[in-house]
Amino acid sequence: AQPSGPLATRRQWLVTQMPVGLAAVGAAGWLPGTAHALPARALSFPRDHGSHPELRTEWWYITGHVQAQGQPWGFQITFFRSRVDGTQQLQSAFAAKHLLFAHAAITDVRGQRLVHDQRIARAGFGVAQASEADTRIRLQDWTLERSDTARGKPDFAASRYTTHIVGSEFGLDLVFDSTQPVLLQGQQGLSRKGPDAAQASYYYSQPQLAVSGTLQVGN
């Protein structure tokens, strides 16, 4: 379907700096063939900003709202990594041992319209990768990266995230700076999802990030 109304023409707008919400990393699942609960452990950063390939499912996501040209917009960016249990013993470099997915969207609040796009690829070959050292995720032409900006700042202001997203009807080039400490969900980062102890994930968030950059809408 062709876009209509305010999204009919590709336009680029400067985002007014303001706080947004960020839930940066979650990891769920366990090693193949087990039903054990995830062990409680102290999360360590920046290592735990990165990927954990021994876990079955992992995700990094950003949600927020901005003002651009005096108009409100919402946005969502999510990257997933999924371990494929059945291919872990294969020796071929082409074996799809991990899959990366991504989904992104912009909400035109005034125009009451949602536009979105997605990507998927197997990890490797420079096409899709998720670093274990820190948040550095690439899926084709979409990226999400974290860098340390502590230089003389308090600990809670130590993170800067950047993302580059180009969809069929929109684009996002945004920078997010932390304004408060990491928030550990559940019991020091181990978040129960149900009555069974195995129904849990490691989960933390960084809310109230200050955001700046540009967004594009239209095709």
Would you name each region that the model predicts?
Residues 1-12, 19-24, 28:
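N-terminal secretory signal peptides
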Residues 36-63:
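Short, Gly/Pro- and small/polar-rich lid/capping loops
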Residues 43-50, 87, 192-198:
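Short Pro/Gly-enriched beta-strand edge/turn motifs at strand-loop
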Residues 64, 75, 102, 172, ...:
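One face of beta-strands
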Residues 97-101, 105-207:
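Active-site acidic/histidine clusters and adjacent loop/turn architecture
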Residues 48-51, 197-218:
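Short acidic, Pro/Gly- and aromatic-enriched capping/linker segments at domain boundaries
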Residues 75-108:
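Surface-exposed, glycine/proline- and aromatic-rich loop segments on solvent-exposed faces
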